[in-house]
Structure formats: structure tokens, C-alpha cells
Amino acid sequence: MKMRFFDFEVTPNWWLCIFGDMPDDESYAIDRVNEPAIKDTFVEINSDMPNARDLLISLMKDNDDVYVKAGYNIKGYDLVIANAIYQGFNPQQVKIVNDIIINPASAYDTKEHLRMQPFAKRRLRGICYQDLLDDNDGSLKEKEAILGLDIMESEVDFNKEHLTEEDKADLTYYCKHDVYACMYYFLKVMKGYVKNKLAIGKKFGIAERDCYMCTNANLVAKALGAKRSSFGDEELIEIFLPTKIREYCYENLPNKVLDQIRTSTKPFTVTMFDNEVSFGNGGVHSVYKNNLYVESNDEWMLMNVDAASYYPSMLIQFECLSRAVRNPAVFKNIFDERIALKHKKNKTQDDEDSQTANKLVLNTTYGASGNKYLDLYDPYMCTRCCRLGQIFLTALANKLVKNVNGLKVIQTNTDGILVYVRRKDVPLVRKLQDEWSKVSGINMDYDIVEKIWQRDVNNYLMIKEGGKVKRKGLWLMDTWEKPGYFLISPLTAYASQKAVISYLTEGKDIVKSIIENTNIMDFMMTCKKGPSYRGVVQRFEDGTEVELFKCNRVYASKDKSLGQIYKYKMYKGNISYAKMPSIPEHCRLANNDLESYDFNEFRKDLDYMFYIERCADLLDIQWLWLNEGQLSITNRFDYF
């Protein structure tokens, strides 16, 4: 099916909707040079047109087997506005519905508001749609800012009763831009998300239109034939160990720790195997030391000991699958097929599609069982799986330390253990892995790590065997992309993080890295106000303030007359200001399309020292070095 993007703008006496169809050549659409030409193909419908309702419904409903109607947050807003127009409401009534969506408390403002209230939750029916906010968060403007698009907004007051032709033209211009932004965001980020959903539909015989309209979790529930159910043990806390792992766990974990996990859901931290080990709803996490550097050498090596498909495996081996799935064999068959296809040579396209579908089902099922709004909801089985996973993996970590001389656990996470061990003892580690697998039926993998700079369990830089660099956490996040996820991260002056990574991994001079970087996006930072704040201002050096958009993109400027950016709210009758975190003291807005800037001109205003000083902050760490079992302080990574 083809994608038809749309977006509404609503004012007291006038509404507007823009439709834009995805070009047949998607590479043409993603090339920003073609943005003006693409926008020229968009169709405008507004309430001034004598047959506006019929035109709107025609574009929404005609050829519904050909076009998927797509947009951002359309379930919560645009489809509701479309339904209000479909009901024959006049622009004033459509605005009331709009206001109730945005501020539900306004439903009690007038009798007409009360009458319109039920329609603030009713979507237009009988169409196939894809909401780009599904399995995501944040606003469209945030996505536009991160992707480098123009994030300027209309200055027209949406509560203005009598719009001029210039006002309408302005709203039309920005509405077209948001439709193009949805198209661009789909191609850059969400296309793979939709493709994966369609793969599930193809494999499990789910109608294509249902695939578009469902979130991943809802679609997986359909694939597994799950039926929402209630269970008498929803409030039960205590869990019991499966017979096959009971002896192993009690032999390799202190009984007090094991029973605390088994009989309580409260998070707690203990010291085991020289780690601070934290147990909680997010799984088990531990570190040997924060701010730790370790590298492999001829005698010692870093080794990742991972449980393969840990949570899907536990759902099968420990019988933790949501009981809303009437036939557990369906899940096991999917798991077995994925393993078989993973090792198959010369895969066909159908094999690849099956792999995609199987992976999505396996990786979504556990999390969906803990969401009370989903058909897979089974809270007892969800907490049981999580806590069994913590117990069994920690038991292995404890046994490794007790049985392998000198082995150090560098960190544990939800499905793996990073250990530092003598190379001659690797066969013993593998033997203990095999024992763990034999007891449980869960396979284990391992891979070699060359180096790790570990700030804490959630922030580290790692070089794997072969030179592949892995980053986790915000400390050295250097891209908006999140591989394996269809989410994007804010811009945080990536130039600094990239320079630090090059310094640590290659020894490249930080200043040289910063100066040589000509990617304008790497110098940008995004900042937003958040729902609890009323607005955003920039306060200049002379004390004046200028109101800004809710979401902005900035960089560090040499111009000292430029000031900080603040978000503000009313607190006990007074305005309360808070500085935007991690934003330059003197910053300039860069809310226009980043491709419209000339970097040679841009760099004349760029305060390079800000980014160099950020590097200093990122490297302001007293590193510990674990070398052949000995721990010492090292200054080998000092730069400043």
C-alpha cells in the first residue's frame, strides 16, 4: 500500500488539512533538494471551500485499499478532528473538539463544550492508518530538530478568530512543512518499523491494514492468538524456582539473597563477587568499579558471557509465557524456527522475512506481558520471569568467581556477564557455561572484548574483537541513531563525544578532531521545555528576554551579547525560571533547515572552545586500571 501523509491545523473559524502522497521513488523524497517540488504536489483542503467536508472524506476514505493514511499522533488528534468534520460540525464546533483534546478540563467551559465532549475521543472509522507516534514518544518538532529539518513555527495565534489571507497562507506553509517532515521521518526512521510489522502480518496471516494500525505488542498478541484474561495470582508476590534450576541456584547464591528476590519485588543492592549488585524490576545490574579501564593482553582477556535470547528462552524453559497465549507451542515453534533459520546458509527472501517476524515476536512478548493495556498482560508471569532471570544469571556469576582463579566480574546486565580472566582459564569458563546451559536448556554465547572504558553499568565505551566500537549511555553518545530501535536521541553536541572517542581509541588530538569536523549537526544541541513548563525564553546579556519556540536547536556562539536559554513556569503566583541543561552560556538559534547553512560562514561564529571544554568535562575522570588482576590509578587518558 502507498503512504498518504496528512496534518490538520484548527482555529476558531477556520480549519485546514494538507495531504501529501509518498512519491513512487522514495530516494527522490529523501533528497532534501527536492523538498519544494514535493510540497508543490500536496493537496490543501480548508473550511472556506464549499465542499470541504466531501473533499476531505474523499481523500481519507476513497481508495482505502491503496493508501495508508499516515501522520504523527493522528490517533490522539488528527483522526479525531477528521471525525468531527465527518459528523458535519462547523469550524467553531471543530475548534471546541480541538480544545478539549488539548485541554480536557475545557470540556466544562460551556454547554456546547459538554455536548462536544464525547467527540473528543472518537476517531474517523473505516480507514487504514499508520500513526508515526506508535511505540515512540516526543513531539514531531523534536524529531524535526534532531533530523536537521526546519523547525520554525507559525506566528499566527491559533485562537485568533478572524484570520487574514496572510495568516491562512502562513498556516498553510507550516502545515505543508509538517506533512513533509512526517514523510521524511518515516523514510529516515520509521520505514523499518512498518516493514517489520508487515513481515509479521505476512507470516501469521494478519490483514495488512491491521498491521499498519497495530503497535508491535498488539500485533504480536494477534500472532500468538492471545486472548485477554484475568488471573487469580495477579497480586501474588512470591515466586518458586523451577525444579531443574532449584539446586543450582541454592548452591551458588547466598540463601538470604535468593529468598529476598523470590519473596519480594522491592529493589535492593548487595555486595557479591566484588561487585555492587542491584536487583529490581529492570533486571540485575552490577559493576566491579566505576571509572574502570580494562584491556585484553597476551595473558588476560575480557570475555562477554551472554545468555542467547535469554528472556524468550526463559518464557519456554521456565514456563513463564503469558497465560493469555492459549497454545504455548506456537511460541516455541517460532523460537525453534528462528534458531534454525539463523544457521541456515543461502537464505531466501521468505527466510529473511520470517526471521524478521520471528525476532519481533520473541523480543516483544515478555515486555508486553507487563503492560495492563495489552492482551498479553499477565503480571505474575512477567515478574516471575524477570526475577528468575536475575537469580539464575547471578548464580552463574557467583560460580565463575568461586571456581575460576583470579576471574573478575567487570559488570553484569540483564542477559550477560563481562568477565576478565586468564586466557588459560577460558576452557573452564566455557565448561561452566555449558553446565549452566545443560541445567536450564538455555544456550550461551561468548565474544571477546579488546578494551572497555566503564563509567558505570549504563555508560561505557567498548572495543570488541576486530575493532568494532560499542557505546552505551549518554556519556559518549555520538549519533541520534539507536541501532536496533526505531527511536532517535537528542542532539547533544556530538562533536565533543566524537573527539573523545577518537582520543581514547586512536589517540587522536581532541582539538584537531574538533577543528576538522565539518558536520554542522555535530555542533548542535536540541532543547525542549517539557510538559510542566509554560514556555521558553532567551535572556540576553543586556537583560532583555525573547520568547522562543517550545523546541529549539542551538549552538555555541562567539557573540557575547547572546544569552542563556531558560524554561519558565508559574509557581505560587510568580514566574519561576530554570536554565536549559548543558546549553552554552552564549548560544545562537539554528532553527532553520541545517542544509541551508554554509559551514564556512557558520564556523566564523562558532565558539570552538565550548566544545573543547565539553571534552574536558567528559574526560574529567580519575580512571582505575585493572591490569592482570591488579587495580591501580592511571593517568594515561588525561588530556588537560
Where are these regions (language model features)?
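Short glycine-aspartate micro-motif
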Residues: 3-7, 69, 302-304
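Conserved DEDDh/DEDDy metal-dependent 3′-5′ exonuclease domain
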Residues: 29-142
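C-terminal, non-catalytic extensions of nucleic-acid polymerases
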Residues: 274, 426-640
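Residues immediately flanking
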Residues: 8, 73-74, 132, 307, ...
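Conserved "right-hand" nucleotidyltransferase catalytic core of DNA-directed polymerases
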Residues: 145-154, 160-308, 391, 399-424, ...
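Gly/Thr-rich phosphate-binding beta-strand-loop-beta motif of the actin/hexokinase/Hsp70
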Residues: 1-22, 309-314
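Helical catalytic core of nucleic-acid polymerases
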Residues: 136-139, 155-162, 277-398, 402-403, ...
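A short acidic (Asp/Glu
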Residues: 14-18, 78-86, 313-316, 420-430, ...
